[in-house]
């Protein structure tokens, strides 16, 4: 849909995912992940030097994009940001004992994998997400350091006391979340939208699940992607 609207798309496999090397789920340390985003942006700038660039992130990627908007090295060079279903507040709450356990584990064994099992039906339209079960790159793992950093950054962004530098927060952002998300609670996005209401266009999708772009029983998610396309075209 983006390409049909003459919008070029560049993507990267995050550390610990896809075809990258390393322990599966070890998308850490965060400062290096943000540097990876720098490289993606610079690559896009090199390919299209006179074209505006927008950074798009979903779920944990949404957490990373919000983080980048706050303190990324090139955050002020971007025209805008699109974030969907970000990891700010999890549906499954992390208790104090669990938090301190992960904190200790992250220090002692940062690459220790924590496995999770997510029902595909909780993600989006079943005929779209069922294929994940046979995807060789799906691993359902996150490491202790990645979990801790993502959790702490999400918490700081929720309370709006996360580190800020550059002009990223002055750039427009489209933030979207489904009110039936069973992975990342919609309350997190509502709080981000309130914290950043001057530059944030917040859209809450009724009866939509975690992967907005993959729809639900009534829709295939096309309208969500089209909303993102219209935002990018408006920049």
List PLM regions with ranges.
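Conserved alpha/beta-hydrolase
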Residues: 1-22
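Short beta-to-alpha linker loops that shape the active-site pocket of alpha/beta-hydrolase fold enzymes
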Residues: 13-17, 87, 208
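Catalytic nucleophile-loop/oxyanion-hole region of alpha/beta-hydrolase
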Residues: 18-52, 219-224
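Alpha/beta-hydrolase-fold enzymes
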Residues: 54-145
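Active-site nucleophile elbow and catalytic-triad environment of alpha/beta-hydrolase enzymes
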Residues: 138, 142-164
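Short beta-strand/loop motif that positions the catalytic acidic residue
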Residues: 169, 175-177, 181
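Short alpha-helix in the alpha/beta-hydrolase fold that links the catalytic acid
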Residues: 171, 185-195
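Catalytic active-site module of serine/aspartate enzymes centered on a nucleophile-bearing elbow/loop
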Residues: 199-201, 206-235
């Amino acid at each position: 849909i983006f390409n049909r609207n003459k919008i070029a798309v560049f993507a990267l496999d995050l550390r610990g995912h896809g075809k990258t090397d390393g322990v599966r789920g070890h998308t850490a340390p965060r400062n290096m992940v943000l540097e990876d985003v720098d490289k993606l942006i610079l690559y896009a700038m090199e390919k299209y030097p006179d074209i505006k660039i927008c950074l798009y992130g979903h779920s944990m990627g949404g957490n990373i994009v919000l983080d980048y908007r706050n303190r990324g090295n090139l955050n002020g060079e971007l025209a805008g940001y699109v974030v969907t279903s970000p990891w700010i507040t999890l549906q499954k709450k992390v208790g104090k004992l669990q938090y301190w356990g992960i904190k200790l584990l992250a220090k002692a064994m940062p690459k220790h994998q924590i496995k999770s099992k997510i029902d595909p039906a909780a993600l989006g339209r079943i005929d779209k997400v069922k294929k994940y079960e046979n995807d060789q790159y799906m691993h359902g793992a996150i490491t202790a350091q990645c979990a801790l950093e993502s959790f702490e950054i999400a918490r700081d962004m929720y309370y709006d006391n996360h580190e800020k530098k550059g002009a990223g927060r002055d750039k427009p952002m489209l933030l979207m979340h489904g009110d039936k998300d069973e992975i990342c609670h919609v309350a997190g996005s509502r709080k981000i939208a309130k914290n950043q209401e001057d530059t944030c266009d917040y859209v809450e999708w009724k009866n939509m699940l975690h992967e907005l772009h993959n729809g639900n029983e009534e829709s295939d998610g096309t309208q969500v992607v089209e909303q993102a396309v219209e935002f990018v075209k408006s920049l």
